[in-house]
Amino acid sequence: MSAKAEYLQQEDFLHRSNKLQEISDLGINPYPYEFPGTSSVEEIKNEFSSQSLGNSEDATNKNTPKVKISGRMVLFRSMGKNAFAQILDNDQKIQVMFNRDFSSVAGLPEDAEITPIKFIEKKLDLGDILGIEGYLFFTHSGELTILVETVTLLGKALISLPDKHAGLSDKETRYRKRWLDLICSDEVRQTFLKRSRIIKLIRQYMDAQDFIEVETPILQNIYGGAEATPFVTTLNALHSDMFLRISLEIALKKILVGGTPRVYEIGKVFRNEGIDRTHNPEFTMIEAYAMNIDYHSVMVYVENLIEYLVGELNNGSTVLTYSHLKQGPQTIDFKAPWIRMTMKDSIKTYGGVDVDLHGDHELRNILKERSSLPEESYATAPRGLLIAALFDELVCDKLIAPHHITDHPLETTPLCKSLRSGEEDYVERFESFCLGKELCNAYSELTDPMRQRMLLEKQMEKKALDPDSEYHPIDEEFLEALCQGMPPAGGFGIGIDRLVMILTDSASIRDVLYFPVMRRLESEND
């Protein structure tokens, strides 16, 4: 039997399956259709935690507020005529008390040989999903509790929960079986609730800045907007290859040409490349473009957006504390303005190398001595890519506080305007960094269609000389759109998964993705 079905033969599964049959034999549907009219545990706590409700006797006399909830039973203990359980609803837990003389089981026949309290003790298990109707009271220790009048089985769990003390210690199991991770870990639930809130807050911020949210195709005839290897698929209806997008950029610029002054998209992007602590082949991005601004204005947008997010998540404070850094615990202030530094200056400041004092051969020697890059990766690289490699190797990890690194070499992108100072070897591009991670990429967008064509053709010629490079056709539709006339514009892209990592102090991108890409198990090939 394959690994994915091993649980079917486990003793606990068989034992719970027998209980399931016994419950069904009593005429109780263990998987009912609905349980309407519930309140959330959070709502109940917010409304009643500060009220004077009375004790268990008041609840028994039905003199306290009646409530109705549903959730998963995660703790249970029996104490004579009473039994206590903890019910997990979303990210909140509440204690419930079953009483031998007061509590009933929905659907249990009056003439059943088993009493309600014995049914609760013998037929229900940790992990079962229960509907609870009852009366609120405070225990002697002051804990808000529901005295259960009626319990309804909403979903019988046939597989045990992990041990409550050990939890899920194996990371791979956590990532593959995220549902268990969510059940067992308050911290994990909070991380994903925070992720959802971050995306909601981003939309609120962008909408308040008069950006229009749009949707553009994931399947594309030609991929572009970034240097990355695409996923390729076949569209059977047209008998043609299609690509999963590697960027949102090109389609959004076409919309800008069409007259929409400010546009953004939050969506999935796919790159058929490596998997590591900060990269997943499928990831979520926001890209945004606005007419009549340059990369200086975009820097302000980006740092104000991040400052806003931190403040909303942190009760108004712009300061976050991090525990997962190899440098040890750090406190970071995200208040704008952030540190601004050119790429060349950052290499001089953090790497101790003034690239203007060194020729290409010397830069290669520095990379050989001070980086872990294979020599063949930069042996024939042009000067701009040597400078970019020095930055990656000598600087990135040292950018703990928020930085904007500006004025990148031309060779790093064909989609950006050159410096207005006239230095055509450098472009008005910045990347934002924090905690040693790239957070944002942004440009003063190139709007000259003839220069854009020249740069794309030059890029294609270089790729043609590299046997390891894939053929990357020029997007003629994009160039035609630019020929229609594109206004001055600034744009940025932020990887939302990496942003969530930073805002939740998560050590790996897998910790902020519900279901990260994982290696296929051998059993899945059976």
From Swiss-Prot:
Its EC number is 6.1.1.6. Binds 3 Mg(2+) ions per subunit. The keyword Transit peptide does not apply. Keywords: Aminoacyl-tRNA synthetase, ATP-binding, Cytoplasm, Ligase, Magnesium, Metal-binding, Nucleotide-binding, Protein biosynthesis. Mg(2+) 1 binds at E431, E438. GO terms for cellular component: cytosol. GO terms for molecular function: ATP binding; lysine-tRNA ligase activity; magnesium ion binding; tRNA binding. Mg(2+) 2 binds at E438. It is found in: Cytoplasm. Disulfide bonds: none annotated. InterPro entries: Aa-tRNA-synt_II, aa-tRNA-synth_II, aa-tRNA-synth_II/BPL/LPL, Lys-tRNA-ligase_II, Lys-tRNA-ligase_II_N, Lys-tRNA-synth_II_C, NA-bd_OB-fold, NA-bd_OB_tRNA. The keyword Zinc-finger does not apply. It catalyses: tRNA(Lys) + L-lysine + ATP = L-lysyl-tRNA(Lys) + AMP + diphosphate. GO terms for biological process: lysyl-tRNA aminoacylation. HAMAP family: Lys_tRNA_synth_class2. This is Lysine--tRNA ligase. It comes from Chlamydia felis (strain Fe/C-56). The lineage of its organism: Bacteria, Pseudomonadati, Chlamydiota, Chlamydiia, Chlamydiales. The gene is lysS.
